[in-house]
């Protein structure tokens, strides 16, 4: 990114500065393509996954489920496909969308039914994702979900799939997304993609999964009525979504923040909305349970000491809640 910050050239220009900027963009495109199992020509850089979903789904007639991200739900019939108590979609053919992994529960959709679009944002970098093996015509990924900069993402799209340009202008990104490319952001995206690919090859997330599972076991030992959402399904290795009786999610967020831990009640994209998780309600949980849920996310460098510290803070705070309830 530092090299990109020093360049003043437009990647569409033919002079030396422009060619240097273009080379950075194309190098990043190759790294992103390698991470997601796509051809470089199938990677279209955007301002993020929200824009990528709009480009892919605008003017389409698609079926999906209520556990999809809001940026996807805006363009689909989200009542068409039901999910079970683990958040797994019922198989369905036709023009469908699929969230590869849920941002709140981490539940992975293992079937290959999506014919139109896949939201791969949460999955990429944490579990293997291969666009070439997907049935979908398009998919979305985002840089900040793999440790890259915010405000840059990519649309993965088959060369055979026609889509109408939604950002009109100079025809950049092979005519699929106009506007001068964010060279600095794209450079960071490429570097993050290369690092994420190495982490997957080195299986660094295996230790994260073990720590996550150990944390959940300790939480259940402390509170046997604690619910871990999606624990019977395949999940991302870094995500834990759980609810404890009598302790609302937003209160937990505040208590953990005071203790030095950044957790969330629902998806971070919906932070500030103090209401029950739409995803958990779609999975069949009641309003009170869904309102008591928090999500704890871990990184590939999370340590046992981090988990011990979190468990100490959480159990101490919940002990006070139980004391007030007389439990």
What are these regions (language model features)?
Residues 1-327:
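Pyridoxal 5′-phosphate
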């Amino acid at each position: 990114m530092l090299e990109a910050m020093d360049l003043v050239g437009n990647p569409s220009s033919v002079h030396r500065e422009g060619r240097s900027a273009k080379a950075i963009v194309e190098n990043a495109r190759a790294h992103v393509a390698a991470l997601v199992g796509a051809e470089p020509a199938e990677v279209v850089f955007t301002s993020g996954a929200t824009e990528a979903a709009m480009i892919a789904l605008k003017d389409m007639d698609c079926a999906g489920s209520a556990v999809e991200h809001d940026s996807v739900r805006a363009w689909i019939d989200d009542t068409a496909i039901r999910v079970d108590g683990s958040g797994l979609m019922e198989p369905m053919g036709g023009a469908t969308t699929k969230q590869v992994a849920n941002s709140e529960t981490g539940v992975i959709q293992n079937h290959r039914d999506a014919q139109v679009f896949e939201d791969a944002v949460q999955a990429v970098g944490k579990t293997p994702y291969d666009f070439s093996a997907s049935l979908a015509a398009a998919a979305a990924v985002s840089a900040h979900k793999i440790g890259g900069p915010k405000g840059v993402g990519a649309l993965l799209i088959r060369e055979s799939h026609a889509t109408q340009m939604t950002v009109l202008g100079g025809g950049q990104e092979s005519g699929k997304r106009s506007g001068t490319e964010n060279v600095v952001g794209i450079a960071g995206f490429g570097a993050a993609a290369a690092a994420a690919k190495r982490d997957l090859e080195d299986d660094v997330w295996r230790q994260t999964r073990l720590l996550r599972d150990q944390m959940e076991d300790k939480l259940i030992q402390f509170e046997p009525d604690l619910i871990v959402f999606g624990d019977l399904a395949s999940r991302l290795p870094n995500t834990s979504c759980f609810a404890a009786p009598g302790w609302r999610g937003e209160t937990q967020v505040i208590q953990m923040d005071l203790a030095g831990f950044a957790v969330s009640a629902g998806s971070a994209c919906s932070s500030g909305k103090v209401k029950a998780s739409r995803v958990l309600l779609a999975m069949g949980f009641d309003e009170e349970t869904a309102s008591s849920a928090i999500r704890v996310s871990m990184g590939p460098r999370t340590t046992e000491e981090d988990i011990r510290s979190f468990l100490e803070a959480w159990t101490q705070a919940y002990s006070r809640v139980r004391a007030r309830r007389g439990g």
